[in-house]
Structure formats: C-alpha cells, structure tokens
A protein has these predicted regions:
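Conserved catalytic scaffold of divalent metal-dependent phosphoesterases
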Residues: 1-32
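Charged, low-complexity, helix/coiled-coil-prone segments
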Residues: 6-16, 36-38, 100-103, 108
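Acidic, His/Gly-rich catalytic cores of divalent-metal-dependent hydrolytic chemistry
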Residues: 45-111
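Active-site neighborhood of phospho(di)ester-bond hydrolases with catalytic His/Asp-centered motifs
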Residues: 31-37, 51-55
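Short beta-strand-initiation
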Residues: 38-39, 65
Length: 111
C-alpha cells in the first residue's frame, strides 16, 4: 500500500476511464491501483497497470454489496469481483428515519 485516502484526502475526482486513470496515476509505477469514490465497479488495463474499483458495499444501482478480493502471490496477483445480494429496503428507509441531509441528491446519484 503506497498511499491511503487519509494521507491524501483531497485527490482529484475524475470520471473513471482508462485515459483518466492513466493520467491521474501517471506518477505511479504499479501493477495494480485500487481506487474508489465512484460506486460502480470499474476495471481498466493498459497492459502495464490494472486500475480496479470494486464498487460500493451499499449505495449502488442494485440490491447488492459489491467488493473485491485481491490475492497477491510471489510474482502475480488475481482479482475477484464479488456481489452479495441483500434486502436494501430497510437501508433505504433508514435515510428517512435518520433525516439524512441531501437524501434526494444521494439517491439520484447512486440508486
């Protein structure tokens, strides 16, 4: 792990694409870069680096939690994308119960 979000909390937010990821991380020499913020699963490969966003374990456009498992061995790694279905109705109802500010904006963006 080179840099975690708590060390660089204000990195630029860009629309995920191979071109944007290559440009954003051009100063990094890595086989794998795991990124986030966007709640959708993305995987890009420019033959030198794989850029992987495992998605969101909550707010996304389906009733599932999405995450990734990265297994690292001596000279290689593998990525497994996992989707776990769950009943998100209680989760969504909690936004009203807790009076979450900007609920409409959040739902428009992520559900």
């Amino acid at each position: 792990l080179e840099v975690s979000i708590d060390e660089q909390p204000f990195s630029p937010i860009v629309t995920p694409s191979l071109e944007n990821m290559s440009e954003l991380f051009s100063d990094k020499d890595a086989d794998l870069i795991v990124f986030g913020h966007n709640h959708t699963v993305h995987m890009y490969d420019d033959k030198e680096t794989i850029y992987f966003n495992p998605g969101s374990v909550g707010l996304n456009n389906g009733a599932y939690a999405s995450y990734g498992l990265v297994t690292i061995n001596e000279n290689e790694f593998s990525i497994e994308r996992v989707k776990v279905p769950y009943d998100n109705e209680e989760f969504i109802a909690g936004f009203d119960e807790k009076q979450v500010p900007a609920k409409s904006l959040i739902f428009d963006q992520f559900l």
